Amino acid sequence: MSKSENLYHAARELIPGGVNSPVRAFTGVGGTPLFIERADGAYLYDVDGKAYIDYVGSWGPMVLGHNHPAIRNAVIEAASRGLSFGAPTEMEVKMAELVTELVPTMDMVRMVNSGTEATMSAIRLARGFTGRDKIIKFEGCYHGHADCLLVKAGSGALTLGQPNSPGVPADFAKHTLTCTYNDLASVRAAFEQYPQDIACIIVEPVAGNMNCIPPQPEFLPGLRALCDEFGALLIIDEVMTGFRVALAGAQAYYGVEPDLTCLGKIIGGGMPVGAFGGRREVMDALAPTGPVYQAGTLSGNPIAMAAGFACLSEVAQPGVHETLTELTNQLADGLLNAARETGIPLVVNNVGGMFGIFFTDAETVTCYQDVVKCDVERFKRFFHLMLEEGVYLAPSAFEAGFMSIAHSEEDINNTIDAARRVFAKL
């Protein structure tokens, strides 16, 4: 047995499923998950000494690559002064100044510890601000594991929420309405059925948890218009897209202004950080200035703030996003060409520094129903064969891939060459 296999066996006796987040268990692709010893630049190194070109990037935060010296040094320096104070610090102010400068729609920002905290707090704030209970989310979009967001859609354009995890009361989930991504008609139907009850829409501007689905041109502006028409707030969940699709996020890339924005992943540079913020009028409703309660023992802790500030300072440098987009385009184009050469039907979606691979005969993949029709079994074989080639992709057909500026053109070319060999075996 490999060291990863031994560790996985031991972990399963002590940790549910052997992992601390389900997708890491390789249940979407089968087999034994890799246990990682270290990472540097564009590469992961497992406990058995094998190296992999990494397109997971810790599920998004590592836009600069692993073990970036600016972030590492900032963490070491901050840790030398103490790990947590439970009191305000200067770095929290500097971080808030930087975030609100980079994302102009955020007049104010509150730091939390995860993307889940950010989305659940933003929804609570929207409900408190509007005095309404219902929310709209989209089929196939993931916004963390808060109870009101673990809801699936049934058939039809509009479905009253039903929980898709035990432990979520049906009475609570019923306030979540699920519509179809990229389908404005389904959203209007929800508002027309509940014109005075919907507090907010929460949406991924690029859906990254049904792989990678960009919005249709009219979709995000249409959501903004519907929120304005019916007096609801628009929450854009940029946990995945923030500072990755563009410096000011997908909202800037697509030209839509939300009332609230949720951030995570890149904002922490690899440390556990989330944030939510937006219009001053809305944020003023948050405790201690307003009645909507939110708190956190480790929120804004100095180590995480130092890492996040260092990361965003690097990400904001000229040319970073142009490089990131160009590398992602090279990979996407190369994979498509390799698939065509070997007769494999493939769609690759990409925006900024994220991408999605779909094995399908369809010409486009634009919503959850398109995604579930793709060939998941072929993806599983592709994943494991690419792993043998030294390329680490997301271990699920429903997760996006992530580029970093640490990836070289040689890394991209090696990945495309590996894919060409793998396609020939599928």
UniProtKB/Swiss-Prot annotation:
It comes from the Bacteria. GO terms for biological process: protoporphyrinogen IX biosynthetic process. Its cofactor is pyridoxal 5'-phosphate. One of its GO terms (molecular function) is pyridoxal phosphate binding. Pathway: Porphyrin-containing compound metabolism; protoporphyrin-IX biosynthesis; 5-aminolevulinate from L-glutamyl-tRNA(Glu): step 2/2. It catalyses: (S)-4-amino-5-oxopentanoate = 5-aminolevulinate. Keywords: Cytoplasm, Isomerase, Porphyrin biosynthesis, Pyridoxal phosphate. Its EC number is 5.4.3.8. It is an enzyme of class 5 (isomerase). The keyword Cytoplasm applies. It holds the Pfam family Aminotran_3. Its main location: cytoplasm. The modification N6-(pyridoxal phosphate)lysine is found at K265. It is found in: Cytoplasm. GO terms for cellular component: cytoplasm. SUPFAM superfamilies: PLP-dependent transferases. Homodimer. Belongs to the class-III pyridoxal-phosphate-dependent aminotransferase family. HemL subfamily. NCBIfam families: hemL, PRK00062.1. This is Glutamate-1-semialdehyde 2,1-aminomutase. It comes from Klebsiella pneumoniae (strain 342). The gene is hemL.
